[in-house]
């Protein structure tokens, strides 16, 4: 159906923009939202990812448009590994993940022009090889960890640390494409 309402991406992530382009979706505008991303008491990583995606979609000022928002949480058990604040924290995160399996949960939410919000959480399990201190130091020095949940980006050099994935690769990168396309189309969005 030509003439679909515009699509706003409520995210500053260049990776999400690149992922959307892979499936032929180019947002009409990028408008990151600023919300409180503090984890609530007893909130699971899945609940956190979903809530943040929904709140970002709701907070975007885009009347009459579709709004797409997402949030990725890296969890080791019930511990969230957010975006590393500095090189020391990035190295600490990599030491924690070294030789272990962890979860990447991406919550994706779409707000229709009517205001209706639909959302889904997509979970992937990632296993990392045991990392040497030299590998950790080199990766941290590269700066590739900046702005990435868990202090690493699977689509870059850290992809060489991953021994197994169970689930959606694009959810690990930051936007599960199959689920995103399904949510958009389910609400009537057409390119």
Swiss-Prot record:
<keyword id="KW-0963">Cytoplasm</keyword>
<feature type="site" description="Important for substrate specificity">
    <location>
        <position position="72"/>
    </location>
</feature>
<dbReference type="GO" id="GO:0036221">
    <property type="term" value="F:UTP diphosphatase activity"/>
</dbReference>
<dbReference type="GO" id="GO:0009117">
    <property type="term" value="P:nucleotide metabolic process"/>
</dbReference>
<feature type="active site" description="Proton acceptor">
    <location>
        <position position="71"/>
    </location>
</feature>
<feature type="site" description="Important for substrate specificity">
    <location>
        <position position="15"/>
    </location>
</feature>
<dbReference type="Pfam" id="PF02545">
    <property type="entry name" value="Maf"/>
</dbReference>
<feature type="site" description="Important for substrate specificity">
    <location>
        <position position="155"/>
    </location>
</feature>
<dbReference type="InterPro" id="IPR029001">
    <property type="entry name" value="ITPase-like_fam"/>
</dbReference>
<protein>
    <recommendedName>
        <fullName>dTTP/UTP pyrophosphatase</fullName>
        <ecNumber>3.6.1.9</ecNumber>
    </recommendedName>
</protein>
<dbReference type="InterPro" id="IPR003697">
    <property type="entry name" value="Maf-like"/>
</dbReference>
<comment type="function">
    <text>Nucleoside triphosphate pyrophosphatase that hydrolyzes dTTP and UTP. May have a dual role in cell division arrest and in preventing the incorporation of modified nucleotides into cellular nucleic acids.</text>
</comment>
<comment type="similarity">
    <text>Belongs to the Maf family. YhdE subfamily.</text>
</comment>
<dbReference type="GO" id="GO:0005737">
    <property type="term" value="C:cytoplasm"/>
</dbReference>
<keyword id="KW-0378">Hydrolase</keyword>
<dbReference type="GO" id="GO:0036218">
    <property type="term" value="F:dTTP diphosphatase activity"/>
</dbReference>
<keyword id="KW-0546">Nucleotide metabolism</keyword>
